[in-house]
Amino acid sequence: MAMKEAFPEDYLSQEELEPSLNVSHHENPLAGRAKRKRTVKNTEVKKRTLKNTEVMKMTEKKTEEAYLVKVEQLAKLKQKQEEDKAAVTLHCFSKTSETGKDVVAPPEGFEQMQSLRFIDNNYTKLKPSDIQGQVDPLFPEVILCVEIYNSRKVKTQEFLVLGRQMLTELKDNIHCATDQVMQKAGKYDPSGYFLIEDVFHNDLRNPSAKDYSYPILDWLWNSKDEALKKWECVLTGELQKKQKLVLGEAKSVDLPRYRTADMQSTHFCDIRFRVGASYVYCHQGDCKHTIVIRDMRMSHPEDVQNRAAYPIMFWPKRRIQKCGVCKIKRASKVAVDDKWASENSSYFCDVCFELLHSEEGPLNCDFPVFDYVHE
């Protein structure tokens, strides 16, 4: 104390120097400046990151809101379309219009509508129309899937039939253009038969029907030698080769033992058949079809339970033959060797045929012309 009091100026200068020395010893001005820069930079990076995150969240929110708005708009549009479909009726297809008068579509317009409709090759199930009377429930029953092929081996129809149904019920539902042609010519023949496992099932319901199997059986009985030779020619081929490979020598060939039965008194459950085998349906003299029983199963709850609805028919959507000139109307005539046509055979509707082959007078037809029937 005495020293401080004696030399106060020296002690004051020393006390002032000590803090400055301490500061100069612990702190570097360049290091502090770099540290401050790093702090500012980190702060800016954090701010930018937060800003980008907020922008992304806002963008996602706006996108989600836009999607929700579009979904709501589509839902409203679909609901409006359904309401419009339920409310709108096409008066041209109804029997009466809004005025209460009968409306009849002209045949030309109806024909064009049939021609212009879209047709593909898929099969469509033809549901039976409203069936009058009491509904006969379907108890556990055998259901057969029967396919019908034309002479070109193209499947034209497919049926689901019950085991208790008659063969005539299937025959009456088989569609063939030959029936229409013969009926139009006034030569329709109600006769016909199914040849299934060496049995001719003849349709003799109509008094004017003929037994198509009689001349065949008569030839077999009275010309056995000739029939046997022809039968050997039929069997010559893969079957004979297989028999020789297995047995060493083919067995003697015998004619099948054909017999007849009435179609109208035969149920499907009464006949012997092989699933997947080909059988014959013949009608109108010599129009033959191939029938194949493709499947056999028991009925289940998903099947149509009304027995009166069977046989249920499946029909392929067919491509209608159009007129080769206008490409709009359905063809009604087919011409062979027509010098005015670009193709042979050529198809025409009535209007185009008359315009092309008449010069203000009778038709100039020095070539065969036939009425065309759509299959």
Curated annotation (Swiss-Prot):
Asked if Nucleus is a keyword of the record, the answer is yes
One GO CC term on file: nucleus
* Key words of the record: Activator, Auxin signaling pathway, Cell cycle, Developmental protein, DNA-binding, Nucleus, Transcription, Transcription regulation
**What is this protein's tissue specificity according to the annotation?**
Expressed in seedlings, apical meristems, developing leaves, roots, stipules and flowers.
Q: Which InterPro entries match?
A: snRNA-activating_su3 (IPR022042)
- Say where the protein is mainly found: nucleus
One family from Pfam that matches here is: SNAPC3
| Compartments where found | Nucleus
Where is the segment annotated Disordered? Answer: 1-42
Show the GO MF annotations.
Answer: DNA binding
GO process terms (BP): auxin polar transport; auxin-activated signaling pathway; cell cycle switching; cell dedifferentiation; cellular response to auxin stimulus; cellular response to cytokinin stimulus; lateral root formation; longitudinal axis specification
Q: What happens when the gene is disrupted?
A: Lethal.
Its induction note reads: Transiently induced by auxin (2,4-D), with a synergistic action of auxin and cytokinin on transcript levels.
- Entry keyword Cytoplasm: no
Its subunit composition reads: Part of the SNAPc complex.
Biological function: Transcription activator of small-nuclear RNA genes (snRNA), which have essential roles in pre-mRNA splicing and rRNA processing. Essential protein involved in the establishment of apical meristems and organ primordia, embryogenesis, cell differentiation and cell proliferation, probably by modulating the establishment of auxin gradients.
Looking up PANTHER family in the UniProt record yields:
SNRNA-ACTIVATING PROTEIN COMPLEX SUBUNIT 3
Name of the molecule in the record: snRNA-activating protein complex subunit
**What does the organism's lineage look like at the top?**
Eukaryota, Viridiplantae, Streptophyta, Embryophyta, Tracheophyta
Q: Which gene encodes it?
A: SRD2
